[in-house]
């Protein structure tokens, strides 16, 4: 693994591909980068330029949400700042099948780059003030990527940015890279990013990026409600765009394209790409059942925001596939889909002395995927729902899913759901921060009465849960409860938090 013992690349074609993928080495710049930068941009840029504590920054998220664009924008900004082009090396691994012939692709490519482009060892480059910056896109399908990266950053002074669209494989690498890694989870567009992309203005996030502490303070949530009211016009316009087309960048950037075109694009480049490419091969090269993956994902879309039990899954799958499929296999495939970050399984809250009961709640990364896959458009916008009241119940489940995925994507935030237990009513979500818990209930309907807050009130009344207040996420703008322990926030304002 010594740097000076670099092995030649397996083909001249691979070297040509690498050079063409790093056009700045020839004095050129990347063409067609969007002017709008996603929320993760300043964090990645800061980490690359030495502002972070870890040498490796991992950006994970579903396919087609802008991870590669983010890397290219960071590279372009570095070049604008005057960083020498030869210091920057980018590799897009999912477009290099020839790497299958390379035993340790990350290390071999790093040594090749050091010898043939940087022209010196990584240590000498750092001493000369030319520390190498490596951008490794979609590494999750590489065997043993994490141990290779660990060796690289342990032995050589480099900064590395890694992207991946598999939570399972990226998470598996975190153990090898403990203490060397900073993780960012980037999902589809945030509501304020949708507004900026559509030209409605630009708003800074309400939640600071330096920790979860503010979430424990009731005044934070009251302030969030005021924040939403202060930016009402922007918020409602952005939420209407989100309701119509979802939060994938392609859907909002191409507002001129028809929904049918966008749906076809999402089905092919996001859902089928994940099922046919990311999940097609299991352990030891065994192929997974593509049809079963599609059916399990279809159920995830159909029961979004809900917690189906085993019997429902078994019955639906057997009817769809005319085969006797066992629960463990279905559960395994659900976890595979969770690994693609297209949907997240929110587990039931575990409490001391109480055996965990209840099924996982299904939260889809974007309701547009459901609309595309099931060919069933359900609006979230209050005005649209008033015109189509028969869709209100479905919209409620989708709103619950949107809130759950939004919470689950906040790094280091512990989120669970609270199933009905004996005499204790259900609560949609429970955030745990340190010793404190914050229950969250989503009630996406026009009228909310005392019965709709029974779960929040029961949870906050039990001293053992240490929940001084709860949050009620609503459809309408008006305060939905006069209980001083409950802060009501419209879904559109809730999604403006980040």
Predicted regions and their residues:
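Accessory nucleic acid-recognition modules appended to NTPase machines
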Residues: 2-3, 8, 252-436
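Conserved catalytic segments around the Walker B and adjacent sensor/switch elements
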Residues: 80-95
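Domain-level recognition of nuclease-like catalytic cores that cleave nucleotide substrates
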Residues: 475-498
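Short glycine-rich substrate-engagement loop in P-loop NTPases that contacts/grips substrate
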Residues: 91-129
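Hydrophobic positions on the alpha1 helix immediately C-terminal to the Walker A/P-loop
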Residues: 70
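Conserved lysine of the Walker
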Residues: 67
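A short, basic N-terminal segment
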Residues: 1-53
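Interdomain motor-coupling "hinge/lid" segment immediately C-terminal to the ATP-binding subdomain
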Residues: 173-302
């Amino acid at each position: 693994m010594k740097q000076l013992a670099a092995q030649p690349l397996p083909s001249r074609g691979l070297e040509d591909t690498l050079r063409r993928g790093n056009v700045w080495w020839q004095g050129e710049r990347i063409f067609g980068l969007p002017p709008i930068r996603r929320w993760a941009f300043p964090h990645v840029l800061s980490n690359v330029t030495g502002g972070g504590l870890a040498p490796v920054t991992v950006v994970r998220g579903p396919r087609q949400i802008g991870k590669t664009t983010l890397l290219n924008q960071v590279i372009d900004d570095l070049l604008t700042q005057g960083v020498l082009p030869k210091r920057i090396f980018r590799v897009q691994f999912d477009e290099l099948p020839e790497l299958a012939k390379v035993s340790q692709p990350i290390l071999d490519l790093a040594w090749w780059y050091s010898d043939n482009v940087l022209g010196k060892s990584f240590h000498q480059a750092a001493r000369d003030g030319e520390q190498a910056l490596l951008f490794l896109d979609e590494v999750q399908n590489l065997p043993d990527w994490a141990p290779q990266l660990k060796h690289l950053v342990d032995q050589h002074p480099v900064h590395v940015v890694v992207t991946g669209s598999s939570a399972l494989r990226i998470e598996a690498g975190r153990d090898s890279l403990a203490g060397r890694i900073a993780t960012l989870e980037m999902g589809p567009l945030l509501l304020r990013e949708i507004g900026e992309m559509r030209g409605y203005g630009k708003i800074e996030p309400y939640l600071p990026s330096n920790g979860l502490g503010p979430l424990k303070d009731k005044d934070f949530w009251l302030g969030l409600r005021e924040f939403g009211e202060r930016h009402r016009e922007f918020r409602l316009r952005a939420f209407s765009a989100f309701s119509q087309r979802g939060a994938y960048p392609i859907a909002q950037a191409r507002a001129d394209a028809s929904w049918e075109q966008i749906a076809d694009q999402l089905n092919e480049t996001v859902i089928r790409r994940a099922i046919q490419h990311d999940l097609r091969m299991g352990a030891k090269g065994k192929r997974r059942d593509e049809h079963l993956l599609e059916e399990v994902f279809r159920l995830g879309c159909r029961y979004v925001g809900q917690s189906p039990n085993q019997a429902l899954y078994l019955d639906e799958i057997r009817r769809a596939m005319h085969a006797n499929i066992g629960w463990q296999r279905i559960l395994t495939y659900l976890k595979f889909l969770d690994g693609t970050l297209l949907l997240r399984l929110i587990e039931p809250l575990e409490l001391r002395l109480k055996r965990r009961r209840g099924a996982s709640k299904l939260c889809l990364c974007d309701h547009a995927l459901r609309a595309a896959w099931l060919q069933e458009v359900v609006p979230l916008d209050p005005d649209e729902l008033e015109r189509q009241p028969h869709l209100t119940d479905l919209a409620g489940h989708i709103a619950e899913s949107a809130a759950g995925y939004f919470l689950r994507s906040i790094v280091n935030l512990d989120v669970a759901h609270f199933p009905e237990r004996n005499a204790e009513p259900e609560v949609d979500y429970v955030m745990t921060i340190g010793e404190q818990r914050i229950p969250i209930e989503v009630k996406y309907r026009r009228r909310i009465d005392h019965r709709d807050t029974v779960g929040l009130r029961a949870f906050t009344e039990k001293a053992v849960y240490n929940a001084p207040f709860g949050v009620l996420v609503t459809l309408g703008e008006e305060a939905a409860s006069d209980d001083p322990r409950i802060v009501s926030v419209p879904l559109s304002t809730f999604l403006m938090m980040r």
